[in-house]
Amino acid sequence: MTEDFSLQELSRLRADFPILGRVGRGGKPIAYLDFSATSQKPVQVIDAISNFYRTSNGAVHRGTHLLGDESTAAFEEGRSILADFIGGRANEIVWTKNATEAINLVALAMRNASLDSAAKPSPVKLAAGDNIVITRAEHHANLVPWQQLCAATGTELRWLDLHEDGRIDCETLGVIDDHTRLVAFTHVSNVTGAVSPVESIVSRARECGALVLLDTCQSSAHMPVDVRELGVDFAVFSSHKMLGPTGIGALWGRGELLSQMPPVLTGGSMIEDVTMESSTFMPAPERFEAGSQPIAQIVGWSAALQYLSGIGMARIAEHERILTSYMLEGISGIDGVRVLGPGADKERIGVVAFAVEGVHPHDVGQVLDSQDIAVRVGHHCAIPLHHFFGVRSSTRASVGPTTTREEIDRFIDALGQVRSYFGGK
């Protein structure tokens, strides 16, 4: 059985994160419970970015000087580091500016292939009568691009529905049929924390000959993720959720699929040859990486992945599982607080959204902030899911590898005061 961190290990871990020493408006150290929105960065990541700019900054794949060669090596090494972390191959990693762009890359490639009458048949080309399937639990980033694709191509958009607690209902898998070309869904909901039944969904998709795209933004920093074991065709990743910098994400795709996808952005760096009349393009992944790339951010993300690997993803998952159960138990003892998501007895991670009776989420967030507890408020880019729960918005607390029981205790204590603060009981 995987062991949780000892108090000494957790203390050493927290010492790597300079921002955890910040004191908030209330005069206490900030209890950061907003890992689902963005993660904090260890000094190893901060130093990697700073050192790159101090010693190695150069353009990638342009020139033969030392700085350019060092930058190119770091840029390409980043592919290998991410590929090793997720169980893929380096030539299957496409750099994007974030996970949203990675999803749009697939959607726009499908659009380009489908609207080009001269395009060769390919697995990403849509035909009359086809459909795309998502779920009601999706972040807007994995909903709106498919709405746009379907509107542009006349394709039907379908979705899997949910149990009352927000988990995907496998009884609705029948919406995936022989005309489904792609099933796109989240590995973990950014509202409920529920882990999706990947095996069941992938199995049904395979029966029907559909491709599968997995959004790992809420899973890849909190549990082991192996794209080949999961059996998907595409997966998207976000650096800033994984202790890395903003401005960099990635698409992983099976090599045989990437090679059949048309480019989305065009320009420098992705061409083989250009004449005044036409152009030819590089093979994947370079075909999808037009223009100058965020090299320093890739260096920082590489350092973050090595940091996570050094801790061990299974250990992080166990630490967060224990804290999630502890948090849910604490919330259950507070009257008037409704958790939007499954209980600790279901497969879930430490993303806990909740509604406080009679109190707006922004007011909840301000009360918590006054006691130096950082949480997220709003609809979390998941309006349809909030409508499913019958609310417009919620407050969300989310844990990470540096979260402590003491921070959870502070959160529960402050949350218990919210309703009385606004005149409730």
Which stretches of residues belong to each language-model region?
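Pyridoxal 5′-phosphate
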Residues: M1-K425
